[in-house]
């Protein structure tokens, strides 16, 4: 759906207020690190997800429990770092507009235990999903990392004062 938004948020670490306003989902992150499990994490082409984070180094880890790849077709905005972890893959369509401090999109996992210890080491889970970008990903001052057994970039990735890892 053009207005699809992420569903079924369950915060497992940290604190945030999550609210929906028409075609926008706002995640107001209170803690430096936030970890959320989502039933689905899709953004329709007319939809927007905003992460309002305490600062540029704040991290929001989003684990997707869906059996399908996440389809990012709309806008994903954040002033800090966003991890989008879906073992079945993450697809940024040609209409995707990602504007964040930093982005890690991966089929690998990251445990709450490691996050609590300040370790952001992605662990392989044996899934063969792919991460594909056909859209525009812009990171201001951070890293853009697309990590999966298969990674395809047909779009644009821009890291202003940052680094791109494919």
Identify the meaning behind each predicted range.
Residues 1-166:
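Solvent-exposed adhesion/ligand-recognition segments of exported proteins
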């Amino acid at each position: 759906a053009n207005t699809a938004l992420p569903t079924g948020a369950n915060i497992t670490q940290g604190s945030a207020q999550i609210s929906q306003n028409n075609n926008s989902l706002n995640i107001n992150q209170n803690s430096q690190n936030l970890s959320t499990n989502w039933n689905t994490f899709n953004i329709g082409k007319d939809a927007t997800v905003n992460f309002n984070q305490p600062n540029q180094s704040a991290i929001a880890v989003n684990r997707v429990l869906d059996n399908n790849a996440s389809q990012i077709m709309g806008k994903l905005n954040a002033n800090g770092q966003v991890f989008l972890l879906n073992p079945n893959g993450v697809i940024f369509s040609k209409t995707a507009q990602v504007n964040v401090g930093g982005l890690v999109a991966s089929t690998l996992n990251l445990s709450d235990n490691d996050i609590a210890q300040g370790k952001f080491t992605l662990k392989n889970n044996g899934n063969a999903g792919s991460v594909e970008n056909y859209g525009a990903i812009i990171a201001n001052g951070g890293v853009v990392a697309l990590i999966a057994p298969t990674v395809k970039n047909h779009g644009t990735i821009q890291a202003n004062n940052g680094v791109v890892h494919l």
